[in-house]
Amino acid sequence: MAKPTVLTCANHKGGSGKSSLAGSLIIALAEQGYRVLGIDGDMQRNLSTTYGLREFGKEKNLYRAIEDVDELENFNGAEYIVKTDYENVDFIVSHEDMALLETSLMLKMAEREKYVSKLIESISETENYDFVVFDTNPTLGVLNFNIFVASDYVIIPVECSAYGVDGLGAILKFYKNTSRVNKNLKIGGIVMSKVDLRKSIAKDAIEVVKDMFGDVIFDTMISTDTSVEKSQWDEEPLLTHSPDSRAANQYRELTKEVLSVVGKKERIVQK
Ligand SMILES: Nc1ncnc2c1ncn2[C@@H]1O[C@H](COP(=O)(O)OP(=O)(O)OP(=O)(O)O)[C@@H](O)[C@H]1O
Ligand SMILES: [Mg+2]
């Protein structure tokens, strides 16, 4: 089986739009006919609940998978996958015990950064996903380090606000540190999120990010749109909940850009 392309939505700044981005990227890729495995790497479980998976994953979840990858001789990553109601979309959900994972990973001695990589390798032996899309927690901790080591591309959503652009240099350093271990890791791009171009600070914020990251900002920006919060409240992905909303269409456009960055051809949209 082929190894999937692993896309990780990351930013240590809380509320920058990681889970919203991951939730929409998954459906937009699935709409194009790709098989997608979403993995919720955040103990807040926001991505899992968006897909109605709040009650799932008591036994099968990312916490168990990472503990078992170390402990079970016949570890089979595919056993931790749950099916969703959405075509082409499967999941590994988060669990509240994920809070324990940071210390648990610290305590494991050998190959401390390779646990998530081993999980993906194990899944690739039996399953055929085109993409894995990770949502991550708002830290620069050991779990995120493991996820970066297992990734091909990091996609960084940045909230278009003063707080959103302040202190972003740290994620760049974190990326550089990780790429010493994972030479294959690339920055897929920066997504400006919650953009309101009528506000003058929006343009300033975009300039600040351009100065810091250069030309890796995606052309497509995600506007402030109440349908994002509404769909999350209703525990449904934005792209099926409000398929014609402004943000949904922007996430689709963004996904086309992501596909061109990762070198996969855009497929005919199946609606
Ligand atoms: N385009 C948008 N328009 C309006 N609200 C948005 C938009 N994108 C995200 N939000 C809202 O902003 C909040 C933060 O977004 P989200 O949960 O995706 O960020 P996050 O980076 O995953 O946060 P955390 O760091 O806590 O995991 C949520 O309440 C979400 O509904
Ligand atoms: Mg989140």
Tell where the protein language model's regions lie, with residue ranges:
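P-loop NTP-binding core
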Residues: M1-K271
